[in-house]
Amino acid sequence: MFAKLHGKKQRPISSINSQTPRTSNTTHANSISLSSGNLIVGSNRNLRQKKEQFGSQQRASGRKLISNKENDDNVNNGGDNNYDNGERVHRHHIPGLKIKAYQAELGYHESRFSENLVMLNLVEFPDIKPGDLVELKTYHKNPSASNGDKKIYFIAKDFDGETKRRAKTSNVSILSGQLQTLLDLPSRSRIWIKLKPNKFDLQADVVEFNIKDCLLNRGDMWVLSSKLVDTCVFMDQRLAFLDSIRGTIKGIYRNGKKIVSGYIGEQTRIIFRSESARLIFLIQITDEMWNFEETGEQLFQKMVNSFFPKIFKKWKDVDTHHTITIAFAISMDLSDTSFKDLTPGESLKNSQDYFRIVVDQVSIIHWVDIMETLREEFMEIRKDLLNKQTDKGYSVANGRFSPVIKSNFLELVNFATTILTDPFKQLDLRHTTTHVMIISPGSGLFDVDYSLLRLTGKKLLSLEMTMDLICLSKAPLHIVPLFRYRDFENKLHHCVPLWLSVFFWNDHDKKSNSEWTPRCKIYDLQMMGITENELIREVDVEYLQLNKKVKSLSEFMNDYDKNAFEVKILCAGSNTKQSKKLNSKFDTVFENDVVVKARKIPATATTTHGNTKFIWRGPKVALPAIKDIQKPNVIPDLSIKTIEASFYDDCNTTNDKISTPTTSNNDNLEMNDSLVSVRSADNQNTSLALDSLKGLSKRNSLKDFTQRVITKFISNIDTSKNKKIKSTLLRDDVDNSPLGSNTPLPSSESKISGLKLQQKGLADENVISKRGNLIIKKNLSIFGLPSNEIMSGSPSSYLGSSHTRTSSKLSNMSDKAAFITEGQKSKHDDSNTYSLTQQLKHRISETWVDIKSPSIPVSSEFANELLPIRWKDVWPKYVARKYSKWRSFTTPAELPITISDFPSKDDFDRNFIFRNHSVTLNTDQEQYNQTYKDLLRDMIYMRLLTGFQICVGRQVEKIELSRESGESETVVNKYLDFNQNDAFKLYLMIDSEIHRITCSSSGIIDVERYLRKDEANLFDQVPSYIPLVKTRYESSFRDAMIDPLHVKRESLNWNQIDQVLAGYGDNLIDRKWHGFRAKYVVLPTDIPPNTYSMVINGKSETLNPEEIRVEGLRRLIGSITRSRLRTEKEKKGRKTKREEIQPEVMFYTGPLYNFINEQQTSLESSAINFKDSIFVNDNNLLNRNVELSKLAYQIQRGEDRITLVNRKWHWKKHEKCFVGSEMVNWLIRNFSDIDTREDAIKYGQKVMKEGLFVHVLNKHNFLDGHYFYQFSPEYVMDTNKLEKTNSHRSTLSDPKQMLRKASTGSSNDPSAMTPFSSVVPAISASNASVADAKEPSRPILMLSNSLVIDVDPAGKSSKQESCTVHYDRVHNPDHCFHIRLEWLTTTPKLIDDLVGNWSRLCERYGLKMIEIPWEELCTIPSVNPFHSFVEIKLAINPWEDPEFKDRELFAKSKFYYHVYLLKASGFLLDNRASKFLQNQDIEFDIMYSWGKPQFKYVQYIHHTGAYVAELRENGCLFLAPNNIYISRVNPGNIIGKIHSASSSSLDAQKVILNFKSTCLDYQKLRSIFLDAKEMWITGKIVED
């Protein structure tokens, strides 16, 4: 029934209970199989476990839970006897309670009548009440695969009046649309309705919600999840929040099944997946990337011809809108010796890392170009790195590509984390989450540095980054991913990182997965060209002969497997005859009496064929023939009553050869002391295979190689007939594991000690005295045997030595309590072992888990512990990981908002320090209808934004319960759920920091912060690391401008942030912190044809392009000011005159300082007049009947006069004029009968017609905008008096007062004060406050205004959505107009919608609004090493070229030619350098409302918005693509190769390549410079 939902080729997870296992059945416990790129290990037991019984710990959430049992025999009219369709019954039976199933008739209703999905006529269903959970089941007599029976859950709602009237016979009505399509039933169909009284048992485990083309941060995910609680959803249901955030339900899981519909409760985990994410592919370029597989395909070609096309196809099928970044990660080995000389776990000593950025944030629409670029770069990378130019110009080979096992894996992971270290970086409002995919030619085994491993794991605990490893090789026969490292004592360890998921790419038919393929690759041997015939001649191994006791081959195989893998548990004194009888079946010897007997084993002869002689040894513990490849973990038998708390330590499990006791003919236990041995330090890491392969080449024949292997094999065998095998046979000549060895301890330390066992029936006391009174058995949990047959233990505690700074002291302690669980804690509470180990376990399990023997398969329980701790909630329980593989690649998940991991109580009490602070809401916020609940929500919201997760689960409940003595029940909240009888309590955690937030009805919010104490600074233990980087358009590698290893997420001052959220932002101490920020510029573009003419008051006005764009900017500012955040009182009151008055933007042409010097008086008076004289006394108000002479006097000489100034526009100067918009504002302020701008325009046109004033060019009527008007000569006041008055007013202006009033723009009056008006502006304008405090000697001129606006004027959001806007007061139409946004807890999608509205408004007036980086361009490479840029040195240096060198010109403008080149190429001025603003001979300081400008270089923006350019002091140009805008403007869906890209897409690469070719072409550049020279000679005019 899932065929329609998931496509034809996707295999659904059955919704019907099945007794078959969820994973592939394997032959035995040690088997490993590869299925769809996933390594499946372990037994054939069903992975599904029995569901937890919640019992008495149900939360007091206000919803009463009823537990009962259904009785499906009471279906009306006979019904369907199999109604539950295999559903598990979880309810307890309540006698006498029967749940009826009602047959009903289906009807449909339209959305215009009701938005409810399902409605019932509750009169006909007496036991169903509004709000109950109800199940709807369809019925088909002959259900098919495409149209089977479906179950839909919904919340009961009664028919409304209109539905009752329209539905004559139907008693169930469903909303037409999605649900109707899913059910696929005609009207009046028969369905079944049944009450589900126990919501808690039926709630879904996981619900997956896909979003696209929007940024949904984790705070909003928490808010939206809370809105979905106590609702029902169905597959492919489209949901909308705030009428803006839209998503689709793509997965509903319960009890390991994917179901069609489900109920969402508080325990349901809602996972948000992104269809528009930022994907980063890091491709490891190692020596193996040029290797060929057995199929003849090169690994790199396998990646570009198989993996990438398949994943692009997946993206196209899902219709994703991702942006992708692809980089090569290379580690070059520059040492003189081969890496084979290094021991396992040892890193390269002399290496250099390179990162080549192939593409950066490119839309997947350009996938064809991406693949071509990828192939070209791979062809060039070898030549670029292996060839080194000598001083004489020769090219010599230098270094070699490192093997993948010795590559820079952790370094590249840290390189990827650099883009996420700042949680308040400028956001991409169209993409959610960042997903890293590392493509490796290896098989998941890496040698890493111990200190760097600790640092990397620590760093990733605080970042919201998902990471997948895709291996191009076949899956190995060991646990993956696997890291080898050497600790500070040079001991070798194997570990599995908990922050990395691994997949093996195999594009062949899935049937081939069932075929056996060799996993050991000896590439040099394979490439020697030896044919099969030559191989047969060199290595001649004859066939084996089976024991004649075996009657059939199948019987022999079954018995062998049973004996090998179903190891019996031998208790002391047990009868071992049965074991002896079974084992003797397979004991054989050589015919020539060469006896191989490592233990006392009864031998029986076998017949042989020909002269072949071989041995079958009974695999009592699957002991390898050549060496001890996998060491079974052993533990004492817990049935023994007295055991000391200190178990045997690490040296015994790692280096001792302890085998399962077997019985000899005398039924005696023998544990040969000679099994303990000590290896020399020089030989401790020698591997047989590695030793044999060293130096293997065509000069060393295969025959020699084979002889060496056989010699190694039999070197320790004593060929004497009657001699037993001596202790040298199992001397530790080889590694203890297939991948390496631990450094052994002295034999005196290797003895098992400290174990006092009391057991009767043990044999030989001599053996006991040597080994201790001990019975040992295998750790059978790793083979998946039932837990009741072995010790019940937590698999997560299967850990190795400590990885903290106290590693050497605590490593043994970790192993001693390796399998102690919560249930056994009471047995060992007498010692400190448990608490210390639990602390250690938690610390280690956050980042990695040590593995004793990587080749031993792990149990399913232990495999679950290998999931990333912070990401565990993403995966549904009981569902195989392979079902989520492609979802991780196509729709990566964001970090879940919840985490179930929490420190133990002992760890929490002992190892955390306590800090606390309290927060109360500022009373000023009450006028905006804010309460302490809103503050509490914002505090939690902000923590989720910075990576915190809400703690849930039993452990955090236990911690909270231990705090509340005397209370029988404790609730730790997940969502905002206030209970009158209880305080709100919520825990959040990130890395080693835990916050406990509590709030009661008093309104005081307490924050308790717990910080892990005595943590070593891991960043001090790792040296600096500067790799070489080559971005997309660079021609050579250079040093990176960032140290990827030492970049981390800084801790935040949460006390300060909480005070800011509460409304106390004026008292900030740390001025470096800021909220979220975005910068936009408005650029001129093509004007729509129908915009040139405008009809104003019935009169047609024709405007030129410049006037249209200026008018567009005024409309934009008007839209911003009308969005001012209002108090509740203002919202209820009438619209006032104040709202009709707009702040003026002063437009100018020519140099900025000329305009400021000319208009300084106007700039000062405009700020003062707008603030202080916004209203005059009612007695002085005029009306429309005023005489023109009196009106002229009031305008020019009244108290609230208009300043007449000389204005220059381009090259024309206009004497003593005013601007139309300025007159409109004056009329509204001073006339009692003019309340709107429209009224003011009509009156202005009237007095203009009467001759009061005229347009300076006699071109326009009176208009509201930037149009110049002059008074008619008869109405002009005395000039001398006017100038004297103006001068007097200028001297009265107080610079400090002007700073304070102008810095907040139009929001400085009380009506504009908002919750963040004193917060965000105060944060950003910190330098202004500092300057004010230092009593500046010069007046400060503010060139921008700020205003706090309401982003949600319709009130759709449940929280206040506000944002601070900074916009220019002074603007040149030939430059960029700037708008900056700052916010804290505002929903980003609402910001995006607001910007979209502004952008559409601009487009109507020939303007384009684009987003650019907030910081200046030169700082980007120091925070984002992936960002591409190019530095261009001009082909002509005009400062030195005789043709263009002009001292007079350069004295006025040193960069005249450079600026002309940029303008001629379509670049517009963005930011001026701070040096330019500070070094001029002026009488004031330049400031902005967002802070003091700190730009090092002048910056330009290309008119397309695609590129940003900087002009350096040396005359070079520094350019970088504006990725944040390019990814926004380009459509994201994939287009086929035969189709061209959309015409609306922006080809940013073409822009930069054309400009670069112009700058490097002498003739093109000379032509442009000649035009610039001619303009200078003609006009002698130099602009900014």
From Swiss-Prot:
Lineage top rank: taxon: Eukaryota
In its UniProt record, a GO molecular function of this protein is: GTPase activator activity
Ranges for the DEP domain?
1198-1273
Q: Which stretches does UniProt call biased (Low complexity)? A: 74-84
Query: What does the subunit section of this Swiss-Prot or TrEMBL entry state?
Result: Component of the SEA complex composed of at least IML1/SEA1, RTC1/SEA2, MTC5/SEA3, NPR2, NPR3, SEA4, SEC13 and SEH1.
GO BP, sorted A to Z? cellular response to nitrogen starvation; cellular response to oxidative stress; intracellular signal transduction; negative regulation of small GTPase mediated signal transduction; negative regulation of TOR signaling; negative regulation of TORC1 signaling; positive regulation of autophagy; protein transport
> Per UniProt, what is the membrane topology?
Peripheral membrane protein
Q: Does the keyword Membrane apply?
A: yes
Keyword list (alphabetical) reads: Membrane, Phosphoprotein, Protein transport, Transport, Vacuole
> From start to end residue, where is composition biased (Basic residues)?
1-11
- Matching SUPFAM superfamilies: Winged helix' DNA-binding domain
Where is this protein localized, as stated in its record?
Answer: Vacuole membrane
GO CC, alphabetical: fungal-type vacuole membrane; GATOR1 complex; Seh1-associated complex; vacuolar membrane
Keyword Metal-binding in record? no
Residue span of region Disordered: 1-37, 49-89, 732-752, 1286-1312
Mark the residues carrying the PTM Phosphoserine.
Answer: 680, 737
Disulfide connectivity for this sequence is none
Looking up Gene3D superfamilies in the UniProt record yields:
Winged helix-like DNA-binding domain superfamily/Winged helix DNA-binding domain (1.10.10.10)
Write the protein's name.
Answer: Vacuolar membrane-associated protein IML1
Name the encoding gene, please: IML1
Q: Which CDD domains match?
A: DEP_DEPDC5-like
